[in-house]
Amino acid sequence: MADKSEKTKARLPRGFADRSAEDIRAVEKMMATIRSVYELYGFEPADQPLIEYTDALGKFLPDQDRPNEGVFSFQDDDEQWLSLRYDLTAPTARFVAENYERLPKPYRSYRSGWVFRNEKPGPGRFRQFMQFDADTIGTPGVAADAEMAMMMADVMEALGIKRGDYVIRVNNRKVLDGVLEAIGLGGEENIGRRLTVLRAIDKLDKLGPEGVKLLLGPGRWDGGKEGEGDFAKGAGLNNGQAEAVLQATARNAQAAQDSVVDSNATYQEGVGELATIEALVRAAGYGEDRIAMDRSVVRGLEYYTGPVFEAELLAEIPNEDGQIVRFGSVGGGGRYDGLVSRFRGEPVPATGFSIGVSRLMTALKNLGKLDNADVIAPVVVLVMDKDTESLGRYQKMVSELRAAGIRSEMYLGGAGMKAQLKYADRRGCPVAIIQGGDERAKGELQIKDLIEGARMSAEITDNAEWRAARPAQVTVAESELVAEVKKILAAQAEERARGK
């Protein structure tokens, strides 16, 4: 006897998420607002593919067998390594380099899309997420960096985040690079250790100085004690080197007095550029409550070469466990003068900012700044008779409603009237259209106000109040279908506006 074939188990891969209609609409609404600010600043839309040659991504080059962890990669028929993009910046650099001669300089563009990280997933940490970037390529001066910070502040306020609930923090990687040079971590041979330092400093808010000091030194067990949890290898700095790094990246640090960096040219250049950015944003009317200079901002990617930015939400909102916490970063960016230059062999200055779309959407929903109250479920035409003539008549009703701009559908399942009304209720449909044999013979139909009907059932117990309420169901001539539905929808909208 043949074995029964096993059913394939339906399961979502770890680190990925399905998206609901509500979330999709919320993201589209939020992104339309962000896009309007980018457009206001004169940026143009652009788009690049999800897949790039791995060497074009720059940070995760293939080894003998496969690319390093961090990206999803595969080989094509020509045995060339391809990877899903891990951000939008590296593909932008490739595009600009490939089309450099025909693009206007400065090239000001924005783009949005999915990016992928082959990293360990966790709560709120996904392997696929959406970013929304803006970039200026071809401008060497820090005026472009100052503009990025100002544009991000304007984005926050356009989304309804009031002053005091956000801040754009600005630093300069040259400050930290100068410190690293001074303590002996300059040069190509120390790229790996520098990246470990950057990622350690990027965790200051989460781990605090002592936790970061372990990552700067021998390493850290994430369980809090030796042998507990996973071990993260440190940068191998000695105590003096680690202290110099922590001193230079303290949130309120000013120009360091320590002689270890006092004469370092890279450090001094970074400090000077920060002073220029601060002067520019203040002259434009952006106070410290909106854009603040902050030495703790480093960003975790190696390719940043100058000013770096981070958009932080200061508002306290519930986390996944219901605890009230400061939400933190929702985006960041900086100057990446070396990315385009890799392809062209000549200096090409560039700066940009990336918004974490999913994270920002979560924050806005928690703050009550994003909802879909203006999205109304469709009017549903119930199917009482299933012969071809009746189906054609129901379809005609739907067509009339759609022609009038009313979102609507004909029920296409196989259930009876009771189940159809239950379907309409689960969809949140505002109105149901009903026409059986008796109504058809009279040229009439019933229009059921599902919102008012639900309210009356839940709230009204007094007969007098019931009679005084708006009718939850009316019978009208077929010719009055559109007018009556519009009337009901308008009444529902008025009640929503009153907060009823």
Curated annotation (Swiss-Prot):
The primary site where this protein sits is cytoplasm
Q: Which GO terms describe its cellular component?
A: cytoplasm
Q: Name one GO molecular function term.
A: histidine-tRNA ligase activity
Which SUPFAM superfamilies does the protein's record reference? Class II aaRS ABD-related (SSF52954), Class II aaRS and biotin synthetases (SSF55681)
> Which UniProt keywords are present, listed alphabetically?
Aminoacyl-tRNA synthetase, ATP-binding, Cytoplasm, Ligase, Nucleotide-binding, Protein biosynthesis
Top-level taxon: Bacteria
Compartments annotated for it: namely: Cytoplasm
GO biological process per UniProt: histidyl-tRNA aminoacylation
Q: Does the keyword Cytoplasm apply?
A: yes
Q: What is its EC number?
A: 6.1.1.21
- Catalytic reactions on record: tRNA(His) + L-histidine + ATP = L-histidyl-tRNA(His) + AMP + diphosphate + H(+)
Q: Specify the enzyme's EC class, one word.
A: ligase
Q: Which InterPro entries match?
A: aa-tRNA-synth_II, aa-tRNA-synth_II/BPL/LPL, Anticodon-bd, Anticodon-bd_dom_sf, His-tRNA-ligase, HisRS-like_core, HisRS/HisZ, HisRS_anticodon
State how it assembles.
Homodimer.
UniProt lists the family membership as follows:
Belongs to the class-II aminoacyl-tRNA synthetase family.
For this protein, the record's PANTHER family field holds: HISTIDINE--TRNA LIGASE, HISTIDYL-TRNA SYNTHETASE
Tell me the protein's name.
Histidine--tRNA ligase
Which source organism?
Mesorhizobium japonicum (strain LMG 29417 / CECT 9101 / MAFF 303099)
Q: Which gene encodes it?
A: hisS
